[in-house]
Amino acid sequence: MKTSFISSMLCLLSLCLQAQHKSDSWNPDKGDSYANPIIYADYSDPDICRVGNDYYMTSSSFNHFPGLQILHSTDLVSWELIGAALTDYPGRGWDDSRPWDVLSPGMKQEGPVPGPDDWRTVPQHGCGVWAPAIRYHDGEFYIFCGDPDRGIFMVKTDDPYGKWDDPVWLVKAKGYIDPCPLWDSEGRAWLTHGCAGSRGGLKSVLFIAPMSEDGSRLLGSSRIIYDGHKTQPTIEGTKFYERDGYYYIFSPAGGVKTGWQTVLRAKSPYGPYQEKVVMAQGDSPVNGPHQGGWVETQNGEYWFVHFQDLDSYGRVVHLQPMTWKDGWPVIGEDEDGDGTGTPVTVYRKPDLPASGVFQPLESDEFETASLGLQWQFPAVPSPYWYYADAAGGTLRLYSVQQSSQWRNLWDTPNLVMQKFPSDRFTVTAKVSFTPNPQLKQKSENCGLVVMGDSYATLRLTDSHDGVRLQMVECMEAHKGTQEWVLFEKGLASESLPEPYSNVYMSGTVPPVAPLPYEECTVFLRAEIEPVPLDGNVPASECTFSYSLDGRRWHEVRSEEGTYKFKIRPGRWIGAKVGLYCNRHHSKNDSGWMDVDWFRISD
């Protein structure tokens, strides 16, 4: 018993140390003040709740797993990643044979509805988990979420650090998104939601339905309670609250990159609702400040978290002060007193106990027996894809055979990636590639990738001449375009001579000494930095380099000079950086790539 208790405590301590991470690339804590964004990472459509002195946040995860990542804070500025609510999809609660609750001839969708197996074999880009709401009610944490192709589901737990229950599907409907529950002062439960025009054929309207007290089912059909076509176009992202005799719906409108934050209020859940814009960009550099949730602290202050769309960096998280005036919230700073605030970029910290200065996990030394919380796959992961070797301090990625319909890495389910952590950072990985010598058709490859709807990867590829290093680019990968090898070089077992030469696609690749299998260890690096534009939203680009010894670095160059890749966002998400190991021919065993460490620095 004593040994078991000690082991449990060591495990818990390991998880806590893993979760509390001091970032080497971004720090919003300025002492007595903070700087936005508080999280320079793609936690899209954030929502927040408070339980005692603790704050919890979740966000959209779309087709990435583990999904519905959970963050925790005690001061609203420093956030730690503590877990994820969704490890599988669509979950045991989904019933393919169940008739649709809401479906009409006017409803449409983009392509066929992905089935349960599709979520494990092919990335369903942009589908899945949209705009969740997190709430604490009667001793349990609830997350309600919309899937535009399926409907609305709920997951719950009594321990946000632990396992969440399987999803419960409240309504099977096309186009239902952005749900939020409310348990009101009269003992009734409600659910508001929006509608995705791409699936439902209608947008800019909000709905409400009565809900069971346990949040497991709707007690009646949804009905429209607000139409924003004239004044609040593309209104969505509902967050439902009750305060001082009013029901409030916080909703973004105007579009992702250029919209504003709207609030509706009424004396009845069914309306009629008054409307007011409570935050807009104004003369601030924060474009489209909207979609999030508000929270009252234990000390009586009000704060609002929301996102800002920064293109390839994703939708980063901001924290705004909030006050009340004449029964309406005012978010940000309202210098002209018109009741519509503008976002702050630097502001005093909330009146809360100081916590450590940390950010969600980034670097990984792979010293635990489970994959770090910062990593996600673009599909439900298979146990065949990787081995977290705590004893060896490595992450082993096995070469996964890709489908016969594979076109490029956009179709690869076994990419293991994480969000960009800052506007400017460097990622370096030490990897060792061991191809399977039994594969007669040499097709195994692995590498470091910067991934959006276009991508670039510094790749190790097995060939009959040995392992070769390739710089590969794929523009508009989401359209099925082919990869292009921009740089290729055989890797000699001895140190590279100086100066070295590059080989381009314009000519044949000359014979060079291959790297023997037993010595295939390479350091791969990508450096990401912003590219200033005339507007407020920066573009980004990256350069690549490699080393055989971790000391002398060789920059990947093009005929024009340093090779620079123009980074693109993914489908509703920012770009990601990560690793993979693939093959394209069948064999009863695979090769692998061992990742010794993956480090992010400024």
State what each model feature region is.
Residues 1-5:
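Positively charged n-region of N-terminal signal peptides that target proteins for export
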Residues 10-19:
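Hydrophobic h-region of N-terminal signal peptides that target proteins for export
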Residues 20-602:
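Carbohydrate-active catalytic/glycan-binding domains of CAZyme proteins
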